[in-house]
Structures are given as C-alpha cells and as structure tokens.
Amino acid sequence: MRSSIIKEGYQKAPHRSLLRATGLKDEDFGKPFIGVANSYIDIIPGHFFLQEYGRIIKEEIRAAGGIPFEFNTIGVDDGIAMGHDGMLYSLPSRELIADCIETVMNAHKLDAMICIPNCDKIVPGMLLGALRVNVPTVFVSGGPMKAGRLKDGTKVDLASAFEAVGKRARNQISDEELREIECAACPGGGSCSGMFTANSMNTLCEAMGVALPGNGTIPALTKEREELIRKAARRIVEIALDERYAFRNILNKEAIHNAFVVDMAMGGSTNTVLHMMAIAKEREADFDLRKINEIAKEVSHIAKISPALYTVHMEDINRAGGVNAVMNEINRRGGVLKTEALTVSGESMGERIAGAKILDTQIIHTLENPYSAVGGLKILYGNLAEQGAVLKTAAMDAKMRKFTGKAVCFDSQEEAIAGIVGGKVKEGDVVVIRYEGPKGGPGMQEMLSPTSLIMGMNLGDKVALITDGRFSGATRGACIGHVSPEAAEGGMIGLLQEGDLIRIDVEEGVLEVLLEEAEIQKRRASFSPKTKTVASKWLKRYQLLVSNAASGAILKTEL
C-alpha cells in the first residue's frame, strides 16, 4: 500500500498516534486509506448539498472495507462571479484546486481517491490534481439541476435569466416578468441544467471512463443520484490497491479523444477545449488543437441541449438514454471512438456502451437524422488567431456561419457591457473584447453578460463577438473566444481598430481581419500591449506564470 509509509514499522508510532486521535483502531491500519476530495460550499447551488453526499460516501467506504479521509477544495460559482471582478478568480481557481488535491493526497500518502465535484472549474481542477497524484480515482459529481418552469409551463434556466436582463434593458419585458424568470430559472440544487460548462465536464468524465455511467445526466438530489454515489464509493474500495486503475492508465490520450468525440456529439461548452487542452498537457499527451477539427469532421451533432435548444436539458438526455446512448449511436460509425479504452468500471468503453439504446429520438437523434453532420465545436485560424480560437457552432444561427462585419473594439468586458447597453453596437458589427485573456485579464473572464445582452437585444443573428477571453457554457450566438495569441502578449486582436473588417468563415475555419500585410506591419511597429495594474498578490502570480489559451491556460513551472 502507498499508505504503508505513514502507518507501518516502529518508526511510524508517532504517525499512528496521530491517526488514532482521529478514531482509527488497530484493525484499520491494514485497510486502504482513501481520500474523499469534496467541494462542498454553501454559496454554489451545485455544491451546497455535497456535505451529505460526502457523508454517504464515507459510510459506504467503511462498509466496503476502506478507511475514508474527507477533505475539501475551494469553489467559485461562475454565475455569481459573472460581470464583475470576481470573475478574475474563476479560471485561476482551477489551479488552486489542482494544487489542493496534489498537496493533501501526496502529503498523507493516501492509497486512492474519490472526487466529488460538480460545477465549472472544480471538475477540471480535480482532474488535473488526480493526474498528478496518479492513484486509483473515481469521479462522481453532485449531478445536474432540473430545468425551471414559468407559470405558463415554459422551460427556463440560468441562460434565460441572463438573457432576460438584455430584454429588460430594451424594455421588452417588465420588472415583474424579469422577476418571474429570476425566481424560476434555478429551481433547486445541482449544476445548472443545460449543457453549460459544469454538465459538459461531468459528461466528459463519463466519456473518459473516470466516472460511472449516469455521472453527467442523473439529476441531483434524487434517489437515482444517491445510488450512483453509493456505487462509486463501493467501486473505489474495490480498485483502491489495483495499479491497473492508476489514474493515468484511465485518463490517457485515448480517453481525451473520446472526450472530444462526445463533446462534438453533444455540443459542449467552449470551456471544455480550454480544460481538455490543460488536461492533455498535464497528462503529457500529444494532442494538438487541430486534432479537434479532425474529430469534428467524423462526429455528427446528435444531441442539442440548452443553450442551443431551450426545450432540452440534462434531465431529458438522461431520460432518453444518457451518455452511453449517445456514445453507442456514434459508435455505429466504426473507428470514431476508442472502444478499447479502460474505464473505472472495469470494462472497456466498448463493453460499457454496448447495448445502450436511444429511448427518445426527439431528444437524442440518430446518425441518419443529426442536427449537423459535423461536430458542435470548431477551431478557427487566421491572421487574427494564429494559434487558434474556439467557436460553439452548435449554438449559433446558420446565417452567421459566413459573416463579415466592422470591428467595434473594447479593451475590457466592463467597457463592452457599457457600450452594448449604450447602443454603440449595431447590426452588422463584430464586437471585439480584448485584454481579457489569461494574462491580460488576468484570469480570462467569461463574457456571458455581454453575449447575453446581445441575444436579449435580438442581435444574436446580426452581430458577432470575438475575444481573447472566454465564454460561459450558457453562451449562444456567433461568439468566438480563446483568441490566441491574446492582446496582452502582442496578438493581432490588440492591433484592431474601429471599423476594421473582420471575416468569419466556419466552413473554411477562418478568422481574419481584412488588412494588407503592410498595414499590419505598420501598426505592429508602433504597438505596445496595454498593461493592467493588478492589486491581488494571487492574480499577480497567476499573470506571471499562466500560458495562453491554446495551451489550456496552464501555469508554467519555469519563468
């Protein structure tokens, strides 16, 4: 056992003495020590109930013959942090969470781990930490929230609430109507109900085989979710001492490939690209951004979920057969999935999904009737994004797939919000929000407030937006993020001027400004990136060490 180093031999009497103070008995020292990495926090709707899930997991681990040690990570609610400087801390929190996992697990030499994430950066943070620790690990999230309903039965979710702000700004709805949406959008505990970042990442945990079936879709606070929690706890005890299930044996290049296949089939959040590239770097898996476009050509988009389609939420995907049904349908086109990949369940991915059926073809489409013949994400390149930019094609209007418009430039999200509300953005424009990348922000804020304002003002099929920042999973429209290189590192996005013509072509995979090379060089000769004064010591360290979005915004280990 890895934990032998803290519990065996006469030299470890002091260590055992400390462990006895926590309640351990003689017979417990021969059992596997299992870390229970929880992320309980009261302020996040997807996490306030995880303390109870942690209790259930510890109960099951003890009953199955293991010794659980629960610890907690931090968490940030991206929705609550949205639209103010709190969002600067969201992406950096991923790195803190990874560091927490590594620190606790390696300091105490625990044998195995079960991770209980749910929302936004907590899932990828725990995945990164688990890769560093490399012990048998099972992921089991808190589960998705159910969709809300208005009095007339209309389904709503958090994206509805954000877009309602834009409608209220244009007096398209009353204060009373806004309040009804506000009170209905998030009806209870769970990760926000659409295919936003949290549910995208929890779904990809299934696709990578690090979680049991149902992890991404079984609603929170249900009997079915509790049973999944219990099964995961029993499973970690079964594999705790089996080196075949060391985390890097499960989360490898094949698992990353499968994650992107499911991402394409279900139209996941653009944040998944950022997080999966970080995971690939941590795993030392050779996975280039261009590979994503290759996968997209092979994978049909067969499940459209909010924000792409407001009538469908994760509970509907669960009822229609879940992730296994999506994967098995995609697998009908042989050679797309890496079916030999091992899962924490013990079977290969091919064995896991075999026999899974679509139970409602109105929710999960067949290969013969896809929403699109290609996947729901696209990486764009061009003189505006030499290292790439990300677009969620699954949630944009078809008429915007070829678009040329005039640049309206803002040097921060706050400037953009004021400009949009103030009427500066008009039909045919391309909103440019820069100096919001990993270094420029610092922290790479999500642009849900400006994108929601654009949608709420009925400009979603008339205006595009590009940024070196990123988007919420709830974002929809012609919104292109993660533009690399970013403005703060001298990227072309920083050289743009008001009125420049920007061309977007999804089919060709192009994002470019229509300028002569001589003009670009003239601007570059006199260009000096803006710098922001950062008061926070943590954000200063982050700004110093963070890489760009094309590399997953991971922290460098050398200056």
Curated annotation (Swiss-Prot):
PROSITE patterns: ILVD_EDD_1 (PS00886), ILVD_EDD_2 (PS00887). Pfam families: ILV_EDD_C, ILVD_EDD_N. It is an enzyme of class 4 (lyase). The active site is at residue 472. GO terms for molecular function: 2 iron, 2 sulfur cluster binding; dihydroxy-acid dehydratase activity; magnesium ion binding. HAMAP family: IlvD. This is Dihydroxy-acid dehydratase. The gene is ilvD.
